[in-house]
Design a protein with these regions (language model features):
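Glycine-rich SAM-binding Motif I of class I
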Residues: 68-73
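Conserved beta-strand signature within the Rossmann-like core of class I S-adenosyl-L-methionine
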Residues: 162-164, 191-201
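A short glycine-rich, Lys/Arg-flanked "PGG" loop and its adjoining helix->strand segment in the class I
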Residues: 175-194
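S-adenosyl-L-methionine
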Residues: 100-157
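Conserved Class I S-adenosyl-L-methionine
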Residues: 186, 207-233
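SAM/dcSAM-binding transferase cores
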Residues: 5-10, 106, 131-134, 151, ...
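A short SAM/SAH-binding and catalytic strip from SAM-dependent methyltransferases
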Residues: 160-176
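Rossmann-like AdoMet
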Residues: 1-59, 74-110, 117, 134-136
Length: 297
């Protein structure tokens, strides 16, 4: 279908449309489409409607990988009738996918009704608006995310209640999947504010990376084409199926488990040093981490 500025609209097997990046040779939200993936991976898994409904004050969502705005807009749509205050903080190194998407609203129907605030977001990197009963503040940071997180200014970002993590794959974008990045991300969380972060990958390497960064980690919900994904959180009770010691034993035998310490994609088994750190983590020393004490992963 149509192609401009390095992107094109593609029709998925289920009839939904999405954006394809020619430079990365990857499609945003492939197979089940933008809205279905956002609802399965983020909205339902994070129980966002219930959490926002019960929340007093401003509910903060970090949107890591704005792309064509499907994840953030889906969150706004499902919570717009709750009479709440919500702040979206989006991050990306480019606005080109969103600019392209807004030229193709006829194919990307999830954007309908949000053209005006998204136009302001493009122009001013901020939009404030009323969405049904909801008061929305939407901020955008145009920057290299790994570099941004390492700067002192990142400490001033509003602390999130939920994180939508949706970067291109580690093979195409390794800088977004390193252990130092997730360690910096975890450092920015408020330890007293429950926060969970799902992502589409189920790789052993990612799960080890998140654990060593400080997160509790569990099996995430399936998204149609994937039987499971991954969810990380700063509090164990936010995870319904935490990884257990049976998983830990499988990791020890894996040929692709060592985190990426630098932004260079490769696969390697655990080093002895990483194994020692991993097996002594709190998640595997508590009741949920012992054989037979948690959900089967």
């Amino acid at each position: 279908m149509s192609s401009t500025a390095g992107y094109r609209i593609v029709k998925l097997a289920n009839g939904a449309h999405s954006v394809h990046s020619l430079a990365h040779a990857e499609t945003f939200h492939p197979v089940i489409g933008p809205v279905a993936e956002a609802e399965a991976l983020y909205v339902r898994q994070l129980r966002l409607v219930k959490r926002v409904e019960r929340h007093s004050g401003e509910f903060v969502v970090w949107d890591v990988g704005l792309g064509a705005a499907a994840n953030a807009v889906t969150v706004l749509r499902v919570t717009r009738e709750l009479g709440c205050s919500i702040r979206i903080v989006s991050f990306d190194h480019t606005l080109e996918p969103l600019e392209f998407a807004l030229q193709h609203v006829q194919h990307l129907g999830y954007l309908a009704g949000y053209e005006a605030p998204l136009g302001r977001l493009l122009r001013d990197h901020r939009a404030t608006f009323e969405d049904d009963r909801q008061a929305v503040t939407w901020d955008f940071h145009l920057a290299d995310f790994p570099t941004l997180l390492a700067q002192p200014a990142a400490l001033e970002f509003p602390k999130p209640h939920a994180i939508l993590f949706d970067a291109f794959s580690p093979a195409k974008n390794p800088a977004m999947w390193t252990q130092p990045l997730f360690a910096n991300l975890f450092r920015l969380l408020d330890p007293a504010r429950p926060c969970a972060m799902p992502t589409y990958s189920r790789s052993t390497m990612l799960r080890v990376t998140l654990l060593l960064a400080g997160f509790f980690v569990g099996v995430g919900h399936g998204t149609g084409e994937k039987e499971e994904t991954t969810i990380a959180a700063n509090m164990l009770d936010l995870i319904s199926e935490p990884l257990d010691r049976r998983w830990l034993e499988r990791v020890r035998r894996s040929t692709s488990a060592e985190p990426m310490w630098e932004p260079l994609y490769r696969q390697a088994p655990l080093s002895p040093e990483t194994w020692e750190k991993l097996r002594h983590l709190q998640q595997f020393l508590t009741g949920t981490g012992f054989f037979g004490k948690s959900a089967n992963c």
